């Protein structure tokens, strides 16, 4: 992961992606706009991506596809760093209809980084390596 100088939170990312409210969007855009090529960038943790994904849908009426597209575009900014898992997951084709979905894949990525199996009841997770799907 490239060197980072700050971690961005959900409220910051939401303002950039929704432009709402406008004064906060302008301030967030100004802050991001101060970044210079070659300078340390900004980390966006998986939890922030997951919260933003749900907030865009439930508070701003984005479709799953539009929320994921907005996150993908945002994470492609040269100053933005995300986990390898988030980067690869956001690049998956048809992610908005994929099973397991975006957040489940982020959770699986965290279990891989921890070098532990993921234990779940989510049947679709059987497609992911090192995953135990419990049956009732």
Predicted regions and their residues:
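Residues that scaffold the ATP/ADP-binding catalytic core of kinase and kinase-like folds
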Residues: 15-17, 55, 128-129
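Short, well-structured N-terminal submotif of metal-dependent ribonuclease cores
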Residues: 1-44, 59-66
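A general alpha-helix detector
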Residues: 12-13, 51-55, 90
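Active-site-proximal, substrate-binding regions of enzyme catalytic domains
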Residues: 53-79
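Alpha-helix capping/helix-boundary segments
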Residues: 12, 48, 87, 106-107, ...
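Histidine- and aromatic-rich ligand-binding microenvironments
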Residues: 8-9, 44-45, 100-101, 122-123, ...
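Active-site neighborhoods of divalent-metal-dependent phosphate/nucleic-acid chemistry enzymes
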Residues: 79-117, 121
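Acidic, PIN/NYN-like endoribonuclease modules and their adjacent C-terminal/linker elements
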Residues: 1-5, 108-136
């Amino acid at each position: 992961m490239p060197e980072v100088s700050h971690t961005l939170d959900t409220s910051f990312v939401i303002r950039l992606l929704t432009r709402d409210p406008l004064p906060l969007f302008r301030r967030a855009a100004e802050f991001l706009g101060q970044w210079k090529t070659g300078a340390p960038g900004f980390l966006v943790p998986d939890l922030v991506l997951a919260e933003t994904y749900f907030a865009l849908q439930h508070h701003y009426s984005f479709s799953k596809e539009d929320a994921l597209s907005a996150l993908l575009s945002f994470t492609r900014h040269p100053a933005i760093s995300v986990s390898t898992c988030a980067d690869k997951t956001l690049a998956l084709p048809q992610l908005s209809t994929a099973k397991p979905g975006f957040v489940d894949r982020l959770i699986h990525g965290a279990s891989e980084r921890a070098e532990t199996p993921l234990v779940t009841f989510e049947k679709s997770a059987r497609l992911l390596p090192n995953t135990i799907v419990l049956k009732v």
